Every structure is written in C-alpha cells, then in structure tokens.
Regions:
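Generic detector of well-ordered alpha-helical packing
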Residues: 87-88, 105
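Asparagine-centered strand-capping/turn motif at beta-strand->loop junctions
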Residues: 88-95
C-alpha cells in the first residue's frame, strides 16, 4: 500500500501549483493497490534452477503532484518453499517527494502455514497497538489459521544507510 500515503483515511493539506493551501482526501492505505500495472513481464530461466520472475510497473501520478514509479518483482524457484519480493521506487517528479510503503498481504496454505517465518533485516519491530504488543515476542512466526482471528500488526523499521536507504 502507498505510495504517497499509506495510513488511515483523513485529510491532508498541501501547497497547490498557485501557492495556495489546498486540501485532499486521503484514502485507506493510499492509491497504489487500486492502480493496475501498466507493464508486466514474466520470465522463466532456461537453465536450472528455472527461476520464475514476474515483474510489473505501477505509476502513481497526479497533475501538479507526485510522480512515483514502482517496479515490483516476485520470484521463486519451482519446488521451493520461498519467494522473494524486490521493489524499486523512483521519484519521476521535479520536486522531492515523501512516500510511505506498507507490505501486507493475505497468503494462505501452502505458502504460509503454522511455523512459517518472516525473515527481514529489521533494526526494530514495534507493535501497532496494545493487542499486537501481546504477540511481539513471536512477531516473525505465523500461527495456524484461527476462526475470528483479530489482526496483529507490527511496524518493521529496516536497517538503513546514512541517507535512510534500505
């Protein structure tokens, strides 16, 4: 979710192209998840291990506003129990641009089952609320499916260089 914004619905103030203050509605988790990919490429390596890659580009652009380009690649090796997500986010605008990015998805069996783990280069992990705080010690390990499960959300702060790049 994101890219310009990735939080709860609300209002945001900004300076318009005429220099006046403007206001816009912020949608739940931003716009990017509702924008279809404009370019999708599927490749399969011809030699072992025959890695499969799906790569796509999504543009979040607004007239007199953000011009963000996101390339996402998901890859896996047939028969493996892992996959990799690799993103490249580029500001195509003429001005610096803030961005937010949330990774959340609803995967099920056989990809995620009880005991599956999330491996991340995390400097810090913080629970989103008091409910999540009760499960912070096992933030990286998935439990079994449970009827009526109340979501448990953690903020992952990845290691970054001096410029904030992760």
């Amino acid at each position: 979710c994101g890219l310009e914004y990735a939080g709860h619905p609300g209002k945001d103030e900004f300076i318009t192209n005429t220099g006046a203050k403007g206001q816009m509605d912020l949608t739940l988790h931003g716009k990017i998840s509702n924008i279809p990919a404009s370019e999708v490429i599927v490749t399969v390596d011809r030699q072992a291990p025959y890695t499969i890659r799906i790569r796509g580009r999504v543009d979040e652009r607004v007239f007199f506003g953000p011009k963000l380009e996101l390339w996402t690649e998901i890859s896996t090796v047939p028969g493996s129990n892992t996959f990799t997500i690799s993103d490249t986010l580029t500001n195509r605008g003429s001005e610096p641009q803030e961005f937010m990015l949330i990774y959340h998805a609803n995967y099920g069996s056989p990809l995620l089952e009880k005991g599956a783990r999330l491996v991340a280069a995390a400097e810090r992990v913080a629970p989103f609320n008091d409910h999540a705080a009760k499960a912070v010690k096992t933030w990286d390990t998935y439990g079994a499916p449970k009827s009526g499960f109340v979501e448990v959300v953690f903020q992952i702060f990845p290691f970054a260089d001096r410029q904030g790049r992760t």
